[in-house]
């Protein structure tokens, strides 16, 4: 129970269930955000949340990353690194594991470097170097930006966004958590650089944005 979390440095939570629901269009962005903010309030600074898409149980009994998340997988992987907490990786994710490993028997996976390896290297480097992603008692601040989004095509909100800030760095995460294009305005202003390509990105409340399905931005200043 939540009464025990201060006895441990880190703990699991049910976030991957909600990420799976998002990938399969069975949940709204509002429901996802409400869950994660509820978990943050319960744990506060007592305990580090483990954010993940796969564990041994999830892989063996529910499915591979492709089965569960499809094209949303890169965006949701980035989310587990950027949202407050510590990312947890399961064996084989770095090699684009695309099968269910046997649970009670020895199994293996091909160690062939694919697209996910580069993604994880970039995310890991950012996690280790940016004080905007610090966790624990002196963790970076968190502020939801999702309420600043206004969709322009009459659909329910598809955009999940938040800001994290440390003493030196400020980071903004913006994600289209939908299989459809998102057209929206964003009541937020600032000059940033995209990670990892370093391109300048200007955010303005006067702009209209279009994001591809499952597209995400990691913006730093």
Regions found by a protein language model. Name each.
Residues 173-178:
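Asparagine-centered strand-capping/turn motif at beta-strand->loop junctions
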Residues 157-159, 169, 213-218:
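Short hydrophobic/aromatic beta-strand or adjacent loop that forms the aromatic wall/cage
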Residues 45-46, 82-85, 167-169, 212-213:
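Short, well-ordered loop/turn elements at secondary-structure boundaries
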């Amino acid at each position: 129970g939540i009464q025990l979390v201060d006895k441990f440095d880190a703990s699991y939570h049910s976030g991957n269930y909600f990420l799976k629901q998002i990938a399969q269009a069975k949940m709204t962005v509002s429901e996802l955000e409400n869950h994660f903010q509820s978990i943050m309030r319960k744990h506060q600074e007592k305990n580090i949340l483990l954010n993940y898409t796969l564990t041994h149980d999830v892989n063996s009994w529910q499915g591979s990353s492709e089965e569960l998340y499809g094209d949303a997988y890169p965006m949701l992987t980035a989310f587990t690194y950027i949202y407050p907490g510590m990312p947890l990786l399961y064996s084989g994710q770095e090699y684009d594991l695309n099968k269910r490993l046997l649970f009670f028997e020895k199994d293996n996976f091909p160690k062939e470097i694919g697209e996910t390896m580069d993604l994880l290297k970039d995310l890991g480097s950012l996690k280790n170097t940016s004080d905007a992603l610090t966790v624990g008692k002196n963790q970076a601040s968190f502020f939801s930006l999702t309420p600043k989004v206004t969709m322009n095509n009459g659909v329910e909100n598809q955009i999940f966004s938040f800001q994290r800030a440390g003493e030196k760095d400020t980071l903004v995460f913006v994600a289209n958590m939908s299989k459809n294009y998102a057209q929206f305005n964003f009541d937020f202003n600032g000059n940033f650089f995209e990670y990892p390509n370093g391109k300048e990105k200007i955010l303005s409340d006067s702009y209209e944005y279009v994001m591809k399905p499952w597209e995400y931005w990691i913006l730093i200043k």
